[in-house]
């Protein structure tokens, strides 16, 4: 059965990330939806970044969002730990992260994924053309 909830980029939910090894975030925790809204509407999965309240070593892939958005504690988005989860593992809506914070998250993602600024400019300027091209 298709999940009928509406998921939007920038929304924060509680989700079950399951059990993971090592330093990867796991368990029931807040996650930030990163995936575009078309993917959110039609896919059975979501691309998310886990959020932690633990003090972490300051990295360029971390975005401090505090507690001003409705999060219970001072929080950090961990863009170096993005993951894809099934919508059935997503539970309670918590809050929405505003555009300014999402821009900071986007910059952290660019850093995390090693995408150069000129590559980003090229993608933004030709995104419609890229969708039309078929890769053989």
What are the roles of these predicted feature ranges?
Residues 18-22:
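Short, charged beta-turn/beta-strand-edge "cap" motif at the junction between a beta-strand
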Residues 26-28, 33-67:
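Compact nucleic-acid interaction/catalytic patches
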Residues 69-136:
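C-terminal terminal-subdomain/extension
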């Amino acid at each position: 059965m298709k999940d009928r909830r509406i998921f939007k980029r920038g929304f924060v939910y509680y989700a079950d990330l399951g059990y993971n090894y090592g330093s990867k975030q796991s368990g029931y925790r807040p996650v930030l939806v990163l995936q575009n809204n078309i993917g959110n509407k039609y896919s059975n999965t979501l691309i998310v970044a886990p959020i932690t309240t633990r003090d972490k070593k300051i990295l360029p892939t971390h975005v401090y969002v505090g507690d001003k958005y409705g999060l219970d504690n001072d929080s950090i988005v961990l863009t170096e730990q993005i993951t894809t989860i099934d919508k059935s593992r997503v539970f309670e809506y918590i809050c929405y992260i505003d555009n300014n914070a999402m821009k900071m998250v986007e910059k952290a993602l660019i850093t995390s994924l090693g995408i150069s600024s000129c590559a980003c400019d090229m993608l933004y300027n030709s995104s419609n053309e890229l969708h039309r091209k078929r890769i053989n």
